[in-house]
Every structure is written in structure tokens, then in C-alpha cells.
Swiss-Prot record:
The lineage of its organism: Bacteria, Bacillati, Actinomycetota, Actinomycetes, Pseudonocardiales. Pathway: Amino-acid biosynthesis; L-isoleucine biosynthesis; L-isoleucine from 2-oxobutanoate: step 2/4; Amino-acid biosynthesis; L-valine biosynthesis; L-valine from pyruvate: step 2/4. InterPro entries: 6-PGluconate_DH-like_C_sf, KARI, KARI_C, KARI_N, KARI_prok, NAD(P)-bd_dom_sf. It is an enzyme of class 1 (oxidoreductase). Belongs to the ketol-acid reductoisomerase family. Residues 3-183 form the KARI N-terminal Rossmann domain. Its cofactor is Mg(2+). GO terms for molecular function: ketol-acid reductoisomerase activity; magnesium ion binding; NADP binding. It comes from Saccharopolyspora erythraea (strain ATCC 11635 / DSM 40517 / JCM 4748 / NBRC 13426 / NCIMB 8594 / NRRL 2338). This is Ketol-acid reductoisomerase (NADP(+)). It catalyses: (2R)-2,3-dihydroxy-3-methylbutanoate + NADP(+) = (2S)-2-acetolactate + NADPH + H(+); (2R,3R)-2,3-dihydroxy-3-methylpentanoate + NADP(+) = (S)-2-ethyl-2-hydroxy-3-oxobutanoate + NADPH + H(+).
Length: 332
């Protein structure tokens, strides 16, 4: 099936301009969505708890700030951009009691819908708009007259117009300037979780730590090991990001490329691929979601233990020392 990609010419910005939008949350994505929608002519309000530290920031940026319940009652399109683990409670306490027939419930990630943690009534639209970039980039690109590609999906089309509404919303945050790709809640959620677990976060972190351990255990200086398996990773990832794997290989030495082509498959071998398939299966059948929800509800004991173990790894101490020598790695 051919991928469907939409652009500004395919979107009707007037649709989102005619809605009352509530953005629940004002973190990385929340601020980018709210400010860009406002600048696109939409009627936007923010939903935050009374004690939220983000309330002052949102008000300083000229946005109306209400409680999540008040914002939901006032709006006819509610975008939930709170953390995954908090969405179910926010929905039950503040949104569900204020949902009206014909409203639209939007998400920036499909987790809670895909795994049935939130079950909207049948008379509301349920859709997703997910920019493929962090909030600060979404906002900066919008202000510069550009955009970050977005995914859109429709889970429930009560109005018969949910896709057009999602596309209009995506255009309102600049996504249609770059391209809006149609997907499903299932595809977005499962590929996102798999990517995080097997490659981007879990896979990369474990690969780097294990490579560091192999070098140090073989008698090499930890500082040298850090440079070779962690620090220089950014150089390679940047090359991949700019030109794909082929572009990265074109830019490195022949020696490095030969080692890549002949040794890489020995590290990421058939056994690793089978482990990846098992991880994907746990995402698909809900095993991971059930485990994570139970872990969160129990106070995150295993999460905290594993986090502490990771923070205590030798690579963290070595890295902190070496990064202090490199001013360009320091965040302002």
C-alpha cells in the first residue's frame, strides 16, 4: 500500500480555526502545539492543574490557562499532551465528564488508545497528530515559516470529518509545510515503542555500555574506551541522519567501512534479530504495556532500581569528567 502524504494544499486551515481547542499539558509538545495553533488563528486554551509550575509560563506567552476540567468543558477539540502514564487519570477525572457529542479527542501518541487504557464514547472523533521532532524544533520551524513532518491517524470517525480535522490541526502547527503522513494508532504506537526499546534507547544504550565494558575489561583506559564507543557515536549518527547508512559509509574511511560491513553483522546477528522479534511481539500483544502500567502503579520499584544501576555505571563517571573538558558539549 502506497504511503499517503499530505501538504498545505491538501489541508483546510479554516477547520481548525473554527474549533475551540484545549491543549492539556504544556511541556515540550504542549507549548509548541498551543503557540503555533494560536498563531494560525485557532482559539486555544491550556489545561493545567492549579499548582502546575507551567501555568505562569503559559500565561506569560499570552495563553489562557484553565484547569484541565474547565478547558475540556469549554473546548470542542481536546488534545492530550500529558505523559502517557498520567493520561488515563486526567481523562477519567477531567475530560470524560466534560466530553460532549461531536467533540474531538486528539492525542500526540497512541499508547492509551492502542492498549485500551482510555475508551472514548462512540459519538466523538478520536485522532492523532504526532510531529516527528521535539517540541522546540516544531515551534522553531513553524516560526521560521517551515515545518516538521507529522503523522496523523484516525481511530474513530464519529463526525465523518475526523481526517480533515486532523490534517487541519497538523497544518496549524506547520506539519503540512513539510509533509503529513497517514498512519494508524496501532502502527504509530507499536513502531514507536519498538524503536525506543530495540534501537534508539534500549539497543543503543546497551550496545554502548557493553562495548565500553569489553574494552575496559581488556585493559584499555576507560577514557579512551569512552571516546571510541560513546563520544564518537554522535559523529556516525549525524552522518546517518543526513545521508542514510549509505551516506555514512561514504563519509568514513575504507578501513572503517570494511569493518562495518564484515563485523557489524557478527554483533547484530540472527540471535539479536530474533530477540528484536520477541520484543516486538511483546509490544504487539500488550505484554510490555501491561508490565509498564503495573510498574508505574506500584511506584516504579524496578524502574528506579534499574535507573540507579545505570547511573552508577563506570561510563557515567568517566563521561562526566571528559565532557567537562569539552565546552561544546555543555548545555547553556
Amino acid at each position: 500500500m502506497a504511503t499517503e502524504i499530505f501538504y498545505d494544499a491538501d489541508a483546510d486551515l479554516g477547520i481548525i480555526q473554527g474549533r475551540k481547542v484545549a491543549v492539556i499539558g504544556y511541556g515540550s509538545q504542549g507549548h509548541a502545539h498551543a503557540l503555533s495553533l494560536r498563531d494560525s488563528g485557532a482559539d486555544v486554551r491550556i489545561g493545567l492543574p492549579e499548582g502546575s509550575k507551567s501555568r505562569a509560563k503559559a500565561e506569560e506567552e499570552g495563553l489562557r490557562v484553565l484547569t484541565p476540567a474547565e478547558a475540556s468543558a469549554e473546548a470542542d477539540l481536546i488534545m492530550i499532551l500529558a505523559p502517557d502514564t498520567k493520561q488515563r487519570q486526567i481523562y477519567a477525572d477531567d475530560i470524560a465528564p466534560n466530553l460532549k457529542s461531536g467533540d474531538a479527542l486528539f492525542f500526540g501518541h497512541g499508547f492509551n488508545i492502542r492498549y485500551g487504557l482510555i475508551k472514548p464514547p462512540s459519538d466523538v472523533d478520536v485522532a492523532m497528530v504526532a510531529p516527528k521532532g521535539p517540541g522546540h524544533l516544531v515551534r522553531r520551524q513553524f516560526v521560521d515559516g517551515k515545518g516538521v513532518p507529522c503523522l496523523i491517524a484516525v481511530e474513530q470517525d464519529a463526525s465523518g470529518n475526523a481526517q480533515a480535522l486532523a490534517l487541519s490541526y497538523a497544518a496549524g502547527i506547520g506539519g503540512a509545510r513539510a509533509g503529513v503522513i497517514k498512519t494508524t494508532f496501532t502502527e504509530e504506537t507499536e513502531t514507536d515503542l519498538f524503536g525506543e526499546q530495540a534501537v534508539l534507547c534500549g539497543g543503543a544504550s546497551a550496545l554502548v555500555q557493553t562495548g565500553f565494558e569489553v574494552l575496559v575489561e581488556a585493559g584499555y583506559q576507560p577514557e579512551i574506551a569512552y571516546f571510541e564507543v560513546l563520544h564518537e557515536l554522535k559523529l556516525i549518527v549525524d552522518l546517518m541522519w543526513e545521508g542514510g547508512i549509505a551516506g555514512q559509509r561514504y563519509s568514513i574511511s575504507d578501513t572503517a567501512e570494511y569493518g562495518d560491513l564484515t563485523r557489524g553483522p557478527r554483533v547484530i546477528d540472527a540471535h539479536v534479530k530474533e530477540s528484536m522479534r520477541k520484543i516486538l511481539a511483546e509490544v504487539q500483544d500488550g505484554t510490555f504495556a501491561k508490565e509498564w502500567v503495573a510498574e508505574d502503579e506500584a511506584g516504579r520499584p524496578n524502574f528506579n532500581k534499574l535507573q540507579d544501576q545505570g547511573n552508577a555505571h563506570q561510563i557515567e563517571e568517566v563521561g562526566k569528567k571528559l565532557r567537562s573538558l569539552m565546552s561544546w558539549t555543555q548545555r547553556p
